[in-house]
């Protein structure tokens, strides 16, 4: 592997120290990065582990460049401890680097390609399934599969492998190796097998098992095809939200894996539904995956459960898609919240609140997020919940008051104009400082009187799935009004456009791009409007209007649909993941047709 690969990875492990940071906060961040690297290394997630080791080592170098440090410096001991740990991590980083080089030398094949090749009569493809558990032994992709105990490979005696290969009915033109138990994430083990098979003049490839857990094949997300949902009387608001959620793989796939989520329902949580909403969603998801060619299915059972829990969602009146989305995600979270029973933290004293304001914002955010996780843990939190920071500053004495709050959707304003407005303009308006003065002034705890103040809202932590609500409905003295301003198509949002520099130095911040994969449009007026959704499926956009599903004609049609968008769904793709996808590695050279 060329040095260019590691040079680019080194550049990607960017380290930023914000102006409000201290030696203590930087040392704390560095130690957390080292801990994360060690955890990832134990999980054989080598690229990410190496990335965090690099960030920690670079931070250990940057701290003395940024701060004047001496034995008398405040928190000198904490920095020395971090520096000591960083020095110890150098050898670990070099070890991982060598493993990465070997890993990307090994030829890889996707499951779909392997299955296609196995059906070609002109090729003699042999599969080798390395296992330790009997349940994994029967996991086969072809009748020409040899199951080999992993102990044969782990031992120093390679003759046992040769004995198994002798039982093959033919001399294979290609050997495809895999392990349901992910043994080949151990690079040294994979390389040992590769060298052994090459010495026998065989052509080995390692199959990537993207989701190795055995699930009901009929319920596999691989079988998903967009299917219409019947409108049961003004239920387009619900149908379009469900279509977008079906496209969230990190929500749907775990629900299909042996009903794992259904077994984790917290029936004792009074804020939940006792599993009603979760079970209803799972049943609907089953129907979608088992549609067997139907053009549409009825979500009546799901709707009845929703209405039994919240009578606001009546089929007789107009309902808001965003309100339904908030309701559903909230109840799904409470059903699956494994930390719901934990007692809340006692409120802070005035002195503690004052001391907290002195912390660097990124450090402050990390503490508040961990406090939130103390009583909130679910698949919804893992994927859909981010964090907002609200900071108010007195314009007389400079005192600040900072609060953090979780969010599942970002409500951003849009100007009421006739020309096209970009999403970036809306985001800038969302984060623009607000002046509080006069009757709307802020009661400063230092000045003890009402003062003019500046208030700003910032995104301090981004979720895996970013949901953005365009505030098209506003309330004025004339009543509620819809804003029909056309929105310019935005297929991708860089994280640096969303998160200010003060939080880009955070412990968990990784530079990312957010890619559009679904959106909901609202047509018409408040009283007689209609919702539709556009969803990306297999790199092709589908326009879904209740029971009707059709392919979007092209970028022009997509741009036209997006101009009326109301709720946007984006999926995070970290620059590290994009780097891993694009990095050079040996792959299958044959053309698969």
UniProtKB/Swiss-Prot annotation:
Leader peptide range in chain numbering: none
Organism: Schizosaccharomyces pombe (strain 972 / ATCC 24843)
Modified residues (Phosphoserine): 338, 343
Enzyme active site: 236 (nucleophile), 530 (proton acceptor)
Pfam families: UCH
Description of how the protein assembles with itself and partners: Interacts with sfp47.
SUPFAM superfamilies from the UniProt entry: Cysteine proteinases (SSF54001)
PANTHER family given in the database record: UBIQUITIN CARBOXYL-TERMINAL HYDROLASE (PTHR21646), UBIQUITIN CARBOXYL-TERMINAL HYDROLASE 4-RELATED (PTHR21646:SF95)
Gene, per the UniProt record: ubp4
Task performed by this protein: Has an ATP-independent isopeptidase activity, cleaving at the C-terminus of the ubiquitin moiety. Acts late in the proteolytic pathway in conjunction with the 26S proteasome. Plays a role in avoiding DNA overreplication.
Enzyme Commission code(s) on record: 3.4.19.12
Family: Belongs to the peptidase C19 family.
GO MF, any single term: metal-dependent deubiquitinase activity
USP domain mapped to chain residues: 227-573
Stated name of the protein: Probable ubiquitin carboxyl-terminal hydrolase 4
Keywords on record: Cytoplasm, Endosome, Hydrolase, Phosphoprotein, Protease, Thiol protease, Ubl conjugation pathway
Cellular location(s): Cytoplasm; Endosome
Any one of the GO CC terms: endosome
PROSITE patterns noted in UniProt: USP_1, USP_2, USP_3
Gene Ontology annotations of biological process type: protein deubiquitination; proteolysis
Catalyzed reactions: Thiol-dependent hydrolysis of ester, thioester, amide, peptide and isopeptide bonds formed by the C-terminal Gly of ubiquitin (a 76-residue protein attached to proteins as an intracellular targeting signal)
